[in-house]
């Protein structure tokens, strides 16, 4: 099952991980999208957007109209959600304008600690 991990890490930590992978020449086995704070992660991944990601999981490239149909929502609302997810780098747009979320599963990782 192709999984993407959404996590919270500082930009510095993300760059250190990138440098480690670059030097080793070995990419991680799973994709990872990092956010700078838990607040930013949850601002991007609202309940409606998570539902949309579920509808897009494993579907391949689809039009926004098809994404709306799969999610059971209106096209205008889904268009706004798609714009936010594209801006955050969570989903991609194909050359022909369709959208794609190429994963079957999403793992969310973050730690809340006392300051």
Q: Language-model features: where?
A:
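General nucleic-acid-binding
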Residues: 1-21
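The DNA-contacting recognition helix of HTH DNA-binding domains
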Residues: 74-75
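A short acidic, leucine-rich amphipathic alpha-helix
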Residues: 64-71
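A short, conserved structural fragment
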Residues: 87-96
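Short, locally clustered residues in the helix-turn-helix/winged-helix DNA-binding domain
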Residues: 54-58
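Short alpha-helical segments that sit at the start of domains
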Residues: 23-51
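Basic amphipathic alpha-helical segments that dock to polyanions
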Residues: 67, 78, 82-86
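Short, cationic-aromatic polyanion-contact patches
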Residues: 42-46, 63, 95-115
């Amino acid at each position: 099952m192709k999984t993407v991990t959404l996590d919270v890490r500082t930009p510095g930590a993300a760059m250190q991980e990138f440098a480690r992978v670059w030097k080793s020449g070995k990419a991680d086995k799973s994709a990872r999208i990092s956010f700078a704070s838990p607040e930013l992660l949850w601002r991007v991944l609202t309940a409606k957007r998570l539902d949309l990601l579920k509808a897009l999981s494993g579907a391949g490239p689809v039009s926004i109209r098809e994404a709306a149909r799969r999610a059971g929502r209106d096209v205008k609302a889904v268009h706004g959600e798609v714009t936010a997810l594209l801006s955050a780098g969570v989903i991609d747009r194909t050359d022909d304008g369709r959208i794609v979320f190429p994963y079957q599963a999403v793992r969310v990782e973050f730690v809340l600690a006392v300051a």
